[in-house]
Design a protein with these regions (language model features):
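Residues that line or immediately flank small-molecule/substrate-binding pockets and catalytic motifs
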Residues: 40-43, 67, 93, 185, ...
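A generic secondary-structure micro-motif detector
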Residues: 14, 38-39, 67, 107, ...
Length: 256
């Protein structure tokens, strides 16, 4: 059964102090979410986070942590994830990829630096997960970066946080892609794509053009454990918590 959660990047502006994080967790819990992904929040310790999420009955299931944390302070990252008692150690994008002129060189740099990280996390019973955008579906030397990463990392402990918005943005059918790559999925980001004045915008689940019946069905068939609602910004200037409510209500009506 798919477990529905909230990606805290959606409410990052309301999570920069411990007090605001506490208030936001209360609101998220009151909406009905029980699972969360930590991303974009203030630089809090696991010991600061744990009593707050416990108070509101929330369970962390995934992170987006700065890539340098894994490279410079891996043992601290292991402790952080274990203190909060979850396995999916995520990064939001590939460092260097947007900065380096030679994208193939950026991939090689990422693989070289993160292969030992992936192996060390595996030794500790943790999973490394990479979040896609559209850029992973550019063709470099005739191959999508996504496929190149899977091939070069060559580890059953290298997984993906699949973002269905960015799949659709890249011209990829999310449902078919989920089924094709089911063994490489750590969790899935649910956000919709709405066209506003000929421009793709992030939108609440069910408000845009993605075919959610197909996506949800594919996630079930692929045994996806966590679907995490995310919205990077707000096409209609909604309060982020209002957007989380809209997505939650839509998905709950569809059995999640």
């Amino acid at each position: 059964m798919i477990k529905l959660g909230a990606q805290y990047f959606t409410i990052r502006d309301y999570c920069q102090t411990v007090e605001d994080f506490d208030a936001s967790c209360k609101k998220v819990s009151e909406i009905g979410y029980k699972y969360i992904q930590l991303s974009g929040i203030g630089d809090f310790s696991a010991d600061e986070i744990k009593p707050i999420i416990d108070k509101y009955g929330l369970k962390v299931v995934c992170t987006h942590r700065p890539p340098k944390n894994y490279l410079d302070n891996l043992e601290n990252e292991i402790k952080f994830h274990k203190t909060l008692d979850f396995k999916i150690c995520g990064v939001g994008s590939m460092p260097y990829f947007y900065e380096m002129e030679d994208r193939s060189e950026a991939i090689e740099e990422f693989v070289k630096n993160f292969k030992p990280v992936v192996q060390r996390l595996k030794e500790e019973g943790l999973v490394f997960a990479y979040h896609n955008h559209a850029i992973e579906f550019e063709r470099i030397n005739g191959k999508h970066t996504f496929d190149t990463l899977v091939e070069k990392m060559s580890s059953d402990n290298f997984k993906f946080i699949l973002d269905v918005y960015w799949l659709a943005f890249a011209g990829i059918d999310p449902a078919k892609f989920i089924l094709k790559n089911k063994d490489d999925i750590a969790c899935v980001h649910f956000k919709d794509l709405k066209v506003v004045e000929n421009t793709a915008k992030y939108a609440e689940v069910g408000v845009g053009n993605l075919v959610w019946e197909e996506i949800i069905s594919a996630c079930k068939e692929a045994d996806v454990e966590f679907a995490l609602v995310e919205q990077d910004d707000f096409w209609n200037n909604n309060n982020p918590f209002e957007s989380l409510v809209i997505s939650y209500d839509f998905l709950k009506k569809r059995g999640l």
